Amino acid sequence: MAHRPRWTLSQVTELFEKPLLDLLFEAQQVHRQHFDPRQVQVSTLLSIKTGACPEDCKYCPQSSRYKTGLEAERLMEVEQVLESARKAKAAGSTRFCMGAAWKNPHERDMPYLEQMVQGVKAMGLEACMTLGTLSESQAQRLANAGLDYYNHNLDTSPEFYGNIITTRTYQERLDTLEKVREAGIKVCSGGIVGLGETVKDRAGLLLQLANLPTPPESVPINMLVKVKGTPLADNDDVDAFDFIRTIAVARIMMPTSYVRLSAGREQMNEQTQAMCFMAGANSIFYGCKLLTTPNPEEDKDLQLFRKLGLNPQQTAVLAGDNEQQQRLEQALMTPDTDEYYNAAAL
């Protein structure tokens, strides 16, 4: 295996300081070396257990410490989750992600989580989960059930992290990523722009991710969604160009990773999203809600895909099982009519 050089903070800072158009040009060149620039991975995220989380993440409406009006819900029944997965597949998603508001999963819930993974995989979808901290045995059980990806974000730089979260250390997050990797599960890990961090902190986050023994296969870059009742509700808005710049630097530093536009897309206009794709983003969450915050509706995404000439990426599925791909491709070729806008909900 070829030696992979480690990034330094000064190198990453230099990327952030490049003229934006030069940075975008470099990022697009890197992107085209490893990916089809017209292909975008489409994923769906479902909250399988909502609210009442004991953590104190200052951005999160699911924390039990903040009064956001969010109603806590118990872990969903397995069949409810699988029905949502069927709908996601019919709408064109190729990966189904399941998120639970926990510090860590309880052992009593593991059999249900395993059944969810097995059921999603049986549909020909990729399965992803985000459940908090994992033990080695839990990671291995999920791997044995067939889990493809595990999401556990670093959120920000090690230096700024303590300003946002105190109930889980940065090292705990790194340890969970290591356990997931050792179990043979692919890693999904990224962060949030807009927490009040500096450009140096954004560089520090990407430095941590890119310098992992193996960089994450998937890197979600979130724009802070400000929720009333959370400590960050009054944070300044993120400048669109600053966000696009972060996407571009992530693409250059992790050339073979999927860079995902995650939370905050509802706040972005089409032009901003288009520039994110130009900067190297090639994955989105598809659907009307990301856990507990809004996300663009499916029909808006299909419309944007058509305008930009983008296509949903196919995934390896069971032989002959390409129904969701055909459905989405048909929707992409349909004019802007009432029928088109209903296509994603079929």
Swiss-Prot record:
Residues 38-256 form the Radical SAM core domain. One of its GO terms (biological process) is biotin biosynthetic process. Pathway: Cofactor biosynthesis; biotin biosynthesis; biotin from 7,8-diaminononanoate: step 2/2. [4Fe-4S] cluster binds at C53, C57, C60. Binds 1 [4Fe-4S] cluster. The cluster is coordinated with 3 cysteines and an exchangeable S-adenosyl-L-methionine. [2Fe-2S] cluster binds at C97, C128, C188, R260. Its cofactor is [4Fe-4S] cluster; [2Fe-2S] cluster. Its EC number is 2.8.1.6. Belongs to the radical SAM superfamily. Biotin synthase family. This is Biotin synthase. It comes from Escherichia coli O1:K1 / APEC. The gene is bioB.
